[in-house]
C-alpha cells in the first residue's frame, strides 16, 4: 500500500498513448455486438479493417444526424455568476506544466475562402465588439464545469473578413500543435466566440492565451486553445482528436 502512495503522479504525456487507444472506436467496440454492426452498416466484420469501416460509417451517420437536428437559434443554457466553478479545472491533451507560452510575434492568420487575408494582432481583435457568456464546458470524458468567457462572436468576425458563409467548414490551428474544425452553421451560432478573456481577465496560457475558440453547443475538445490560424474551406479538415476516431460534430 505504501509503495502505491509514494509513486509519483503520472503526467498526461505519459498516459496519452493509452488515452488515444481508448477513444471513441474502442467505446463502440465494447458496446455494439458484431451482429449489430453488420445489421446497421452492411460491412463484412471478419477483419479489424471491416470493423473499423463499420464504426467509421456509424460515426459519419451520427454526424449527419446531429447536423440535421442542429439549429442556430437553439442556445446553450447560461448561468449566473454564482454558478461559476472554482477552481476551474485545467484540461488539454498534455499536462499543465507543458503549457506553451504565447509567441512574442503572435498574430492570428486568416485563410481559405475569405476576401481579407490580412493577419490580426491581439490589439485589433480587442478593439472589436465583445460578447460575454457564462456557460457549461462539457468534456467528452464525462465531467463538466461552468465558466465565464468573453470575446468576439465568430460569426461577426467571419463577416468582417469577407468569409464565404456558404462554405462547409471552419478550421482552427493552434500553436501548441492542436487542431479542430466545425461546420459553418455552428460557427455562425451566436454563442460561438473567439474568446479573449476568462473570468473578466485576459486569457492566461493555461486557459488558451491569447485567443481560443469557445463553443458551448459542442463538447469541450472543440473549444480549441492557443489559436494561431483560421481557415474557411469546403475540404474536410478533420482535427487532432477527430482523426483518431472522435465524433466530428460533437454536439451537446
Label each PLM-derived region with a short phrase.
Residues 45-252:
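Structured, non-membrane catalytic/scaffold regions adjacent to prosthetic-group chemistry
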Residues 4, 23-24, 28, 71, ...:
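Short, intrinsically disordered low-complexity segments
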Residues 26-47:
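N-terminal export signals
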Amino acid at each position: 500500500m505504501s509503495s502505491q502512495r509514494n509513486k509519483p503522479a503520472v503526467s498526461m504525456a505519459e498516459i496519452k498513448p493509452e488515452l488515444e487507444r481508448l477513444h471513441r472506436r474502442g467505446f463502440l467496440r465494447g458496446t455494439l455486438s458484431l451482429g449489430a454492426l453488420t445489421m446497421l452498416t452492411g460491412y463484412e466484420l471478419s477483419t479489424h479493417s471491416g470493423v473499423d469501416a463499420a464504426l467509421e460509417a456509424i460515426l459519419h451517420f451520427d454526424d449527419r444526424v446531429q447536423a440535421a437536428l442542429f439549429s442556430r437559434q437553439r442556445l446553450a443554457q447560461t448561468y449566473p455568476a454564482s454558478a461559476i466553478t472554482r477552481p476551474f479545472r485545467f484540461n488539454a491533451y498534455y499536462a499543465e506544466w507543458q503549457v506553451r507560452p504565447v509567441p512574442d510575434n503572435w498574430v492570428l492568420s486568416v485563410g481559405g475562402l475569405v476576401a481579407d487575408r490580412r493577419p490580426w494582432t491581439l490589439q485589433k481583435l480587442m478593439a472589436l465588439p465583445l460578447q460575454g457568456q457564462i456557460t457549461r464546458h462539457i468534456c467528452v470524458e464525462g465531467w463538466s464545469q461552468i465558466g465565464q468567457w468573453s470575446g468576439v462572436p465568430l460569426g461577426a468576425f467571419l463577416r468582417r473578413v469577407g468569409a464565404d458563409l456558404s462554405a462547409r467548414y471552419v478550421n482552427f490551428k493552434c500553436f501548441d500543435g492542436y487542431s479542430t474544425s466545425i461546420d459553418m452553421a455552428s460557427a455562425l451560432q451566436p454563442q460561438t466566440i473567439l474568446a479573449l478573456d476568462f473570468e473578466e481577465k485576459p486569457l492566461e496560457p493555461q486557459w488558451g492565451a491569447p485567443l481560443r475558440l469557445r463553443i458551448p453547443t459542442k463538447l469541450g475538445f472543440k473549444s480549441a486553445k492557443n489559436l494561431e490560424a483560421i481557415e474557411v474551406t469546403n475540404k474536410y479538415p478533420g482535427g487532432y482528436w477527430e482523426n483518431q476516431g472522435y465524433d466530428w460534430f460533437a454536439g451537446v
